[in-house]
Amino acid sequence: VTSSLLDGYRLLHDGALALAEVERAGIRIDVEYCREKVAWLDDQARRSDRRLRSSALGRAWLARFEGSASWASGPQLQAVLYVDLGVKPYKTTEAGMDSVDEEALRQAGVDGIDHLLRLRSLKKMGDVLKQFLRYQVGGYLYPNYHLHTVTTYRSSSSDPNLQNVPVRDKEQMDVCRRAIVPSPGNVILEVDKSGIEVCVAACYHRDPAMLSYLRDPGADMHADAAKRLFFLDASVRDLKRLAGFSTVLRQAGKNGFIFPQFYGDYYEPCAQNVACGWCKLPRVGDWTDDDGLPLDGVPIARHLRQHDVRGLVDFTEHVRRVEDWLWQERFPVYYKWRQDWYARYQRRGSFQMKTGFVCGGVMSRNQATNYPVQGPAFHLLLRTLTLVVDRIRDFKSRVVGQIHDSLLFDADPDEVPALVDMVQRIAAEELPRLWDWIIVPLRVEAKVSEVDGSWAEMVVVE
């Protein structure tokens, strides 16, 4: 049963009050570390700037734009790279422009690209830490959390934006998250709603195959996708023993294929991302037996060539067939729901989320099918937050942050088991009672730092 708009209002009202307590609690940072690291990052940025200026890319850039040259300008980079230097674009943006994101730049093969990417990375890390220093008061940050700024009715953060701390790049994550530390004698505890958007989507489309995956803890749709993508016949259990499967091929199946497909991408960019991004295979020309990352010591190209996949063109056609398998054979009910949902949106111009909120206006196909999932996925976390904040008033621990699909605690080490158990119980028992449209198990994953450690070094709570 879909909630009413009044139910949605009450959720945001209670959530705003709970987030106010999270803001008031504050999150501790290592101020001295931030200052030292900012100085180091600025020095490294100056060095990268000098190297970029002396490279082929930098010289062409300065020749075209002279005093107005800006390394941060995307349009300038497009002109230099794709017009002056004649590089063939690797991919385009949704607006049809030649892309200059990291993935596209790494395929360009131009002297100076590494220095530009390094400069970008250094700037991103520096900007995060400088924001920390700007907004800290007595060694604590008190970021604002908003519930009224995002179209999908998710939260946002500002002053500083704690939800913008890097996580995908290992160095960026380590440098920035190392600044977040617990109160003396405490630990940082992060509890994450695992795969929450996939679970919420399943509550809409009710595809039997997807429900089976989500209800069976031993099932692994990402490993199954990797088996299809890479012509692997062994059982998932045996494959996970092979070096490179879980760390590369399964992740390629998950983040390079399954999730992009669920969010509306199609086979061609997926093939490029899986092959060239995850597996480090060449974009141009035939692959050799020595190309790509190894699977159990054997280069992946050697394995693919045994299945008549000799280059990116062949692999792209193979991924097209895997895409057909995904939607026509594996998840046909999910596919039909996407078509029907978008058609209904086109007729009405709006739709109502499971949690009661209404979205309307001009939307792309991807927006119209993703928004009803993204909003309720966050609302499950928000309801969890309100319950936890209310129940730990007599605890020494405090919720100090809400990051995407997770809650961040400044926790007393002795209270960690109780906190994890509380969130697990809310997810597994209380939320399904509150919202009877939840028809799949909701799981959580918890990670914890050492006592007086940092957010950068976390271990899984068993």
Regions found by a protein language model. Name each.
Residues 153, 192, 226, 270, ...:
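Hydrophobic, well-ordered secondary-structure elements that form the walls
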